[in-house]
Amino acid sequence: MGLDLKALVSREPTRLESFATKVVAIDAYNAIYQFLATIRGPDGMQLTDARGRVTSHLSGLLYRNASFLSMGIKPVYVFDGRPPTLKSAEIERRRNVKKGAAVKYAAAVDAGNMDDARKYAQQTTSMRDGMVDDSKQILKLFGIPYIDAPSEGEATAAYLTQTGDAYASASQDFDSVLFGAKRLVRNFTNSGRRKIPNRNMYVDVQPEIIETEKTLTTLDLTREQLVDVGILIGTDFNPDGFERIGPKTALKLVHEHGRLEDIPRIQDELGSVSYAEIRKIFLEPESPGNIEIEFGATDYDGITKYLVGERSFSEDRVAAALNRLRRALEKRSQNLDQWF
């Protein structure tokens, strides 16, 4: 579901180039889901290799990471660990949404409505066995580090910004702000030209950055209070939120009363919400321990052998992407040498 803080946080447009030389901790599952949902054929079906295995995520990781490295960006991918018990309701909700979308997809295909078919196909997106291993394999070949979080990937990505190991975390979800990320970048892995569903129109999706401290100052809230605002709206750990409370009402209530326990109108509902545990998930997430981030060299031959030889990618397209990366890195190296 993700947290609906869009109307409240302070967002500023930015450019990918502004992250050159900076480490960005990417919510891996969030990025991979985006690739799986958007990189599809005209009928809405995902790309596959000769054995029928999905390759949409690998295509996204190839082109996006080649672009990142070409610009001098240092991506680090953070994979989810075991989900908190409180997330089970949200996981079940997502499962039901996908089942319903699958039925609608089949009906749209039968009716010959390919726009609807593609829309519903995207809603069926799920992470299947092997996709995480596939993703880690291509990251290794690029020399890009990845981290297995003990629980929520966004929490560990936020932790990396707190320790100074990363400049920002990257995710479409606003949960990173509640987890304490110093900076959150949205549209980081899906920026560019995108088609508007059911319309023959395209938009340019631009990255945007959210400074958590600026957001807290603008809203006149502590981080603890912002977590309470999130709980009122609804998080992955209480997806229904509170009845008839949206972002602006939640902010007003916390301003007036300070904390959940002191808001009169929600007391009947509050007893059925594990709000103390949800607070702890955001404010005291499980520690990832000592993390060492090491970047390696790109294995151009290894990427080609894996994607072309094992996953049925076009040799010409892979070569073109890697050649662009090689030329960009050579140019950056030459420019750097001029300073010495």
UniProtKB/Swiss-Prot annotation:
Biological processes per GO annotation: DNA repair; DNA replication, removal of RNA primer
Region ranges (I-domain): 116-258
Domain of life, source organism: Archaea
Record-given protein name: Flap endonuclease 1
Keyword Acyltransferase: no
Entries under PANTHER family matching the protein: FLAP ENDONUCLEASE 1, FLAP ENDONUCLEASE FAMILY MEMBER
Gene behind this protein: fen
Enzyme class: hydrolase
HAMAP family on file: Fen
Start and end residues of each stretch annotated as N-domain: 1-98
Positions that bind Mg(2+) 1: 27, 80, 152, 154
CDD domains referenced in this protein's UniProt entry, alphabetically: H3TH_FEN1-Arc, PIN_FEN1
Pfam families, alphabetized: XPG_I (PF00867), XPG_N (PF00752)
Molecular function via GO: 5'-3' exonuclease activity; 5'-flap endonuclease activity; DNA binding; magnesium ion binding
PROSITE patterns: XPG_1 (PS00841)
Subunit and interaction comment: Interacts with PCNA. PCNA stimulates the nuclease activity without altering cleavage specificity.
UniProt-listed InterPro entries: 5-3_exonuclease_C_sf (IPR036279), Flap_endonuc (IPR023426), Flap_endonuc_arc (IPR019973), HhH2 (IPR008918), PIN-like_dom_sf (IPR029060), XPG-I_dom (IPR006086), XPG/Rad2 (IPR006084), XPG_CS (IPR019974)
EC number: 3.1.-.-
Keyword set, alphabetical order: DNA damage, DNA repair, DNA replication, Endonuclease, Exonuclease, Hydrolase, Magnesium, Metal-binding, Nuclease
